[in-house]
Regions:
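Polyanion-binding surfaces on beta-sheet-dominated domains and ring/shell assemblies
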Residues: 1-168
């Protein structure tokens, strides 16, 4: 977007169904839409959500759950959504863009949650790469078919021109 500093993008999202991790799902959908639109970006925006859940009733231990369901989100002690800018070509491959947290976590739990979300967002980025590769293959196939059709059309036009010359 540096080349087009005045470029503005408005994204409108409507929730049709919420099975959990809604914010990270919406952010990932926006990120993929921006990638597929061809807008030049410094990296890919990928996101993930993690929840801090009680593992047992009696011991009070807590564990992090990645990509929680809606039910898990409501039962969680805390949850956090992290958005990252991922660019494999730069020295800082993963930059934290922002977080949204609900509930209370200790400083250590926050660091663990961000690390878990970073790993998950990196996996989302790899999925985006697979989608983009597939789209490129489809485009190349379509383009190749178009070239083949153009060659057939040219041959057909040449044969018509030759027949027309022969009739004269």
């Amino acid at each position: 977007m540096e080349k087009n500093a005045s470029l503005g993008v408005i994204v409108s999202i409507q929730e049709l169904k919420n099975d959990g991790s809604f914010l990270s799902s919406a952010l990932n959908a926006c990120g993929l839409a921006l990638i597929l639109s061809g807008i030049e970006m410094k990296g890919w925006m990928c996101s993930a959500t993690a929840c801090l859940m009680k593992t047992g009733e009696e011991d009070g231990k807590l564990s992090l759950v990645l990509d929680p369901t809606r039910e898990e989100e409501t039962q969680a002690k805390a949850s956090m959504t992290c958005a990252f800018l991922i660019n494999e070509e730069t020295e800082d491959k993963t930059i934290l863009l922002g977080t949204k947290m609900r509930g209370k976590m200790t400083e250590m739990e926050v660091f663990e949650c961000v690390a878990l979300c970073r790993d998950a967002a990196t996996s989302v980025c790899k999925y985006f790469d697979q989608v983009l590769t597939l789209r490129e293959r489809e485009f190349e196939e379509r383009y190749r078919l178009t070239d083949e059709k153009m060659q057939m059309f040219k041959k057909m036009m040449e044969s018509i021109a030759e027949k027309t010359k022969a009739v004269k």
